[in-house]
Swiss-Prot record:
The chain crosses the membrane at residues 171-188. It is found in: Cell membrane; Membrane raft. Palmitoylated. Palmitoylation by ZDHHC7 prevents the lysosomal degradation of FAS regulating its expression at the plasma membrane. Contains a death domain involved in the binding of FADD, and maybe to other cytosolic adapter proteins. The keyword Membrane applies. Glycans are attached at residues 38, 115. Residues 204-305 are annotated as: Interaction with HIPK3. The gene is FAS. TNFR-Cys repeats lie at residues 45-80, 81-124, 125-163. This is Tumor necrosis factor receptor superfamily member 6. It is a single-pass type I membrane protein. Residues 23-170 are extracellular. Its main location: membrane.
C-alpha cells in the first residue's frame, strides 16, 4: 500500500513540475513586455518636446537660447534672450547658443535693408547703382554707365541695358565703305605688280658695252633646254607641259622610253613641248608658268649666255678691225 502512495507522489511531482515552469515563463513574458513598454515610454516624448535626461522639456522660443534644463516633464527650461543686434534665433529650439547676425559688406556693394533682431537675421540689399543677379547674393556689381542712352534702367537684380551709338555705328559703316574700294585698289596694284614681274622675265634685256639692248621675248630656247631641265624637278616639268597642251599619251610615251633616266625624261618633255609650241613667245610661256625663283634662274642662264655671246662677238670684231 505504501508503494502505491510513493508512485502516486512521483506522478504528481512530474506533472506539477512542467506546469510551474510554464507559469513562470508566462510571468517572465509579462514582465518582459512591461519592461519594453516602460523603456519605450522612457525614451519617447510628445511631439514638440525634446528629451533632456529623464524629462521631456519644452523648447526655448525664437529670440532666446537655453541656459538651464527643465526640472520636470512638460516644463520649460531656463531660457535667456539673445544679444540684440548681434545674435538671433528664428525658430523654437533647445540649443544653448544663438546664431550670429550676418554682416552686409559695403566693399562688396551691399548695405543693410533690415537690421538684425533677436528673432530675425540681417537682410542685405545692393547699394544704389549696384546689382546682383545670383541667389544667394554674396556681392553686388556696379551698374553699367550708358553713353548713348538707356533701354532699361539698372535694378537691384539686373544690369543697365544701353542703347548703341547710332552715330558711332554710322561712322563704322562710312569707314567700311571707304575701306572697301581702297582695299580693292591695293589688291589690283599688287596683282598688277606680280604680273609685271613675270612679264619682266619675258621683256628682260641684256645690254652690251655700246648700250644696245637684246629683247628675250623670242629667244631661241633650243640650246638652253638641258640647262633649264637641270633646274626643274620632273614633277614641275610634267605639270608645265601638261598645262601647255601636251597630250597625256605623249607624256607617257616619253616617260616609258626613258624609264631609268629622269634627266633625259625632263629634257625630252621640254624639247617636245618646244618643238610643238615654236620659238615665238616660248620663253614668256615658260617663265610665266614657273615659280618666281625658278623663273629668275632660267632668266639668268639665258641672259648670261647671250651677254657672253655678244661680248665674244665684239672682241672678234675688234680683232678683225686691228688686222
Amino acid at each position: 500500500m505504501s508503494g502505491i502512495w510513493v508512485h502516486l507522489s512521483l506522478i504528481f511531482i512530474s506533472v506539477s513540475g512542467p506546469l510551474s515552469k510554464g507559469e513562470n515563463a508566462h510571468m517572465a513574458g509579462i514582465n518582459s513586455e512591461g519592461l519594453k513598454l516602460n523603456i519605450t515610454e522612457a525614451n519617447s516624448c510628445q511631439e514638440g518636446l525634446y528629451r533632456e535626461h529623464q524629462f521631456c522639456c519644452q523648447p526655448c522660443p525664437p529670440g532666446k537660447r537655453k541656459n538651464g534644463d527643465c526640472k520636470r516633464d512638460g516644463d520649460t527650461p531656463e531660457c535667456v534672450l539673445c544679444s540684440e543686434g548681434n545674435e538671433y534665433t528664428d525658430k523654437s529650439h533647445h540649443s544653448d547658443k544663438c546664431i550670429r547676425c550676418s554682416i552686409c559688406d559695403e566693399e562688396h556693394g551691399l548695405e543693410v535693408e533690415q537690421n538684425c533682431t533677436r528673432t530675425r537675421n540681417t537682410k542685405c540689399r545692393c547699394k544704389s547703382n549696384f546689382f546682383c543677379n545670383s541667389s544667394p547674393c554674396e556681392h553686388c556689381n556696379p551698374c553699367t554707365t550708358c553713353e548713348h542712352g538707356i533701354i532699361e534702367k539698372c535694378t537691384p537684380t539686373s544690369n543697365t541695358k544701353c542703347k548703341g551709338s547710332r552715330s558711332h555705328a554710322n561712322s563704322l559703316w562710312a569707314l567700311l565703305i571707304l575701306l572697301i574700294p581702297i582695299v580693292l585698289i591695293i589688291y589690283k596694284v599688287v596683282k598688277s605688280r606680280e604680273r609685271n614681274k613675270k612679264n619682266d622675265y619675258c621683256n628682260s634685256a641684256a645690254s652690251n658695252d655700246e648700250g644696245r639692248q637684246l629683247n628675250l621675248t623670242d629667244v631661241d630656247l633650243g640650246k638652253y633646254i638641258p640647262s633649264i631641265a637641270e633646274q626643274m624637278r620632273i614633277t614641275e616639268v610634267k605639270e608645265f607641259v601638261r598645262k601647255n597642251g601636251m597630250e597625256e599619251a605623249k607624256i607617257d610615251d616619253i616617260m616609258h622610253d626613258n624609264v631609268h633616266e629622269t634627266a633625259e625624261q625632263k629634257v625630252q618633255l621640254l624639247r617636245n613641248w618646244y618643238q610643238s609650241h615654236g620659238k615665238k613667245n616660248a620663253y614668256c610661256t615658260l617663265t610665266k608658268s614657273l615659280p618666281k625663283a625658278l623663273a629668275e634662274k632660267i632668266c639668268d642662264i639665258v641672259m648670261k649666255d647671250i651677254t657672253n655671246e655678244r661680248e665674244n662677238a665684239n672682241l672678234q670684231n675688234e680683232n678683225e678691225n686691228l688686222v
